[in-house]
Amino acid sequence: CIAAEWQWSVQIPGIISNETDDHPQAFLWIPSDCAQVRGVMIGTHNMTEETLFENLLFREKMSEIGMGLIWITPGWDQKWDVSAGSQRAFEQMLEDFAAISGYNELKYVPIVPFGHSAMATYPWNFAAWNPERTLAVISFHGDAPRTNLTGYGRDNMEWGKRTIDGIPGLMIEGEYEWWEDRVNPALAFRLMYPRSCISFLCDTGRGHFDIADRTAVYLALFLKKAMEYRLPETYDVDKPVMLKKLNPENGWLAERWHPDQKRRAKAAPFKQYKGDPHDAFWYFDKEMADMTEERYRQERRKKPQYLGFVQENSLLAYHPKSHVKVAARFLPEEDGLTFHLKAVFTDSLHTTISDEHSSTFPEITRICGPVQKVNDTTFTVRFYRMGMYNKRRTGDICLLASHDGDNQYKSTVQELSFRIPYRNTEGKRQYILFPGIGDVKAGVESVTLRATSDCGLPVYYYVKEGPAEIDKN
């Protein structure tokens, strides 16, 4: 949702992004009825951080527990290398947000580092360097703590004697991106650090680039549990919060996920678990373990189905060795903005359209990039708060075809990406005249924007920051 509200923003001091040659910008959302911020979840700009943080259902759940969200674009420091200034920049960012928002507790609020894919390694390292302040850790479609397979593909940070004992951490891996070598380091970490609290979810029926509503609900429950189990009943908001350290033996164990598994050990309290504890993960309690098992049950023993995209009446090619498996061309209508794509079911090779699938239609949704959905097959280019000056990302669009499955067929997904020609360097140059807005009196709910193009083209707007929404002009 590119129109989602972010009330405040600050620049990240001391850091220059190679994507913009400028300071990254951090955006803060706090629930509108929040009297006290009890935690802040921080994610930087890779892909699905933005998708999750602007998910309406997820925001509703965060409002219930008083969790704020910070999204930083461009992302920086995939390692959390304190020698490169990340720690100082992080602390200054929260000081600045406390000053401009009026929520002074942001200076000391517990943090949940969150990252996807190439940014999914830093959350563990953040926790190792900030154990007293880390409420929980989430590595989404990512990797294990201290892994040798980092999301960014290079060496990991060396922890020395640091640990994340007593801090709940969650690793999530999609079923359709499954790789045993990513899971094994998480199991090994539990053996190496028996006081650690490492949870795991196989995001069944999902891939690497997407985040379903049901997964957002799972994350929300994990965060709610972290607050329930770790925050003291009362504390001084103007001082660091003394978080409770968890004892893993007070939690539950559940067997790790296996592809095509027919029998599973029953989830149970830590000391009563009858399966192999070396092949199991930790969970807060019965509710969290049961939700994990239910996710696995929902997709078990169902028939697979496959998705593709049609553009100009042709099924787009599927490239199994590519990171994003389907690529489109930007083929806009005469306005230069509107384009069309259709999601279809295909055979297992993604070469022909198939009739073997669920009875309902798949849908296309935005993952990231300057795009807005008009209807099931129509989309339009719309720039947003990421800005116009990111040479890597401003022109990148990534979309998702998905279907949640039914009693017979599994949930399935397929991603697609392409670039738009940005910036345009051909044709007549245009100028936009955007008259300033005068003082607005209290009680006024809407203001008309009167920008015009000297070429007579329509002008579009987006909210960079602040509690406002755009409705045409």
Q: What is each residue range found by the language model?
A:
Residues A35-V40, I65-I70, K107-P110, P131-V137, ...:
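Loop/turn elements at helix/coil->beta-strand transitions in domains of secreted/extracellular proteins
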Residues W80-L106, I111-P113, N125:
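Alpha/beta-hydrolase active-site loop
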Residues L135-A220:
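The feature captures the conserved acid-bearing segment of alpha/beta-hydrolase catalytic domains
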Residues I2-V40, I111-F126, N130, T134, ...:
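A domain-start/cap signature at the N-terminus of enzymes
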Residues S196, T204-T338:
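Alpha/beta-hydrolase-fold serine-hydrolase catalytic core, especially in secreted/extracellular enzymes
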Residues V40-M41, N46-E95:
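Active-site machinery of serine-nucleophile hydrolases
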Residues N46-E50, L69, P74-W80, S117-T121, ...:
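Solvent-exposed loop/turn segments at secondary-structure junctions
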Residues P304-N473:
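Solvent-exposed beta-strand/loop surfaces, strongest in extracytoplasmic domains of secreted
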